[in-house]
Curated annotation (Swiss-Prot):
Its main location: cytoplasm. Keywords: Cytoplasm, Ribonucleoprotein, Ribosomal protein. The keyword Ribonucleoprotein applies. One of its GO terms (biological process) is translation. SMART domains: Ribosomal_S3Ae (SM01397). This is Small ribosomal subunit protein eS1. GO terms for molecular function: structural constituent of ribosome. It comes from Trichoplax adhaerens.
Length: 258
């Protein structure tokens, strides 16, 4: 008789279930922090695999983009404007973010388009003082002149061209003289759109003038010290509340429609 293992005795039971391991036991939660110019600093949490061997958790977090409504960032009612924030640095259990773009909700944009008026759009590339190249998309609509009887408010092609040039000049002039932090401060109340509306009154009356979208095309190398300054010298000292953004001499426009 051959000496060896009895294979039948070593076999396991058929249909035996595998041990189920919960994947969340290998993950950690991190707090996502918005820059200090927003009223609400703690905007949510994000999940990432724990540091294991050569795979570092912070590397998996950097570059993540979070889209947050302005109403959630400012405890306000303007929910149609959305800000994109990109994870730049990880400090302890906190993810420090920076501005990565802005857009308006599609339902708000569709509600602005009406009959008997002209839609005017412009897109402009402008560079900030700290090296960020941004692309701005502006939108505006013509409206009736005071005491106008005619129901239509159509602008001529030459007037549209002049308004478009005015949009380009105002955005380029304002953005090229300030840094990214100040650009965000002006996007929160959309004061650039109000400036365009006032400047174009002599060409043709406008209403519902907005910066509908902002893209970050190029950005300089990450400066950690500047990022910490943007977040109020570290998360531990800054807390969960930011500072209110105000602009002297600026009054927010009255919303004709929601």
């Amino acid at each position: 008789m051959a000496v060896g293992k009895n294979k039948r005795l070593t076999k396991g039971k058929k249909g035996q279930k595998k041990k189920i391991i919960d994947p969340f036991t290998k993950k950690d939660w991190y707090d996502v922090k918005a820059p200090s110019q927003f009223a609400v600093r703690n905007i949510g949490k994000t999940l990432v695999n724990r540091t294991s061997g050569t795979k570092i958790a912070s590397d998996g977090l950097k570059g993540r983009v979070f889209e947050v409504s302005l109403a959630d960032l400012q405890n306000g009612e303007i929910a149609f404007r959305k800000f994109r924030l990109i994870a730049e640095e990880v400090l302890g259990k906190s993810v420090l973010t920076n501005f990565h773009g802005m857009s308006m909700t599609s339902d708000k944009l569709k509600s602005l388009v009406k009959k008997w008026q002209t839609l005017i759009e412009a897109h402009i590339d402008a560079k900030t003082t700290d090296g960020y190249l941004l692309r701005f998309f502006a939108i505006g609509f013509t409206k009736k002149r005071p005491n106008q009887i005619k129901k239509t408010a159509y602008a001529k092609t030459s007037q549209c061209r002049s308004i478009r040039k005015k949009m380009t000049d105002i955005i380029t002039r304002e953005v090229s003289a300030i840094d990214l932090k100040e650009v965000v401060n002006r996007l929160i109340p959309d004061s650039i759109g109000k400036d365009i509306e006032k400047s174009c009154q002599s060409i043709y009356p406008l209403h519902d003038v907005y910066i509908r979208k902002v893209k970050v095309l190029k950005k300089p190398k990450l400066d950690t010290a500047k990022l910490l300054e943007l977040h109020g010298e570290g998360v531990a000292s800054s807390g969960d509340a930011g500072s209110a953004v105000r602009r002297d001499g600026y009054e927010p426009p009255v919303q004709e429609s929601v």
